[in-house]
Amino acid sequence: MNIQYDKSKIESTLKETSIDDSDLSNVVYLVEDPHTAENFDEISKQIAAKVRMGHKPRSCDALYRSGKYYNLIEFKNRKSADLRIGNEMVELHEKAFDSLGQLAIYLNYQNSLDNLAKETRLVVVYNDGKGAEEATSDIAS
């Protein structure tokens, strides 16, 4: 499937993709990392529009390429312990699965999803009560 993407809407940074603006009176960036990343929510939106899906599938927040790996990053502005409550882990697994399929479409990946999965890491960034200024990212190393 060959989709033309609007790269100007996809190109971003890890900082910008980590934003939690659900409360406009308290906008939080989970990381301050200026490294280039791709807005995976936007990629998902563009794929859904092109293949005429009735809804946008679940997607991770960012795609960061590091060496031979594709890093799908999900930012969660909550404590790690909260990720184990209720359906949070199930939703995270579903989001990772949907994102892997979308990544294959985005990359026009010709091998199996199993091979792509071996080249992909899921990174979950959470906030255990520290301010955004204390959050760090070591994915770039």
Show where each model-derived region lies.
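Catalytic micro-motifs at enzyme active sites that drive phosphoryl/nucleotidyl and oxygen chemistry
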Residues: 51-52, 61, 109-113
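Polybasic (Lys/Arg-rich)
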Residues: 136-141
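Conserved catalytic cores of phosphodiester-cleaving nucleases, focusing on short active-site segments
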Residues: 62-64, 69-77, 99
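Basic, amphipathic N-terminal segments that precede the first structured/catalytic domain
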Residues: 1-55
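Catalytic cores of nucleic-acid endonucleases
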Residues: 78-132
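Beta-rich catalytic cores
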Residues: 58
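Glutamate identity and glutamate-enriched acidic tracts
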Residues: 11, 16, 32, 38, ...
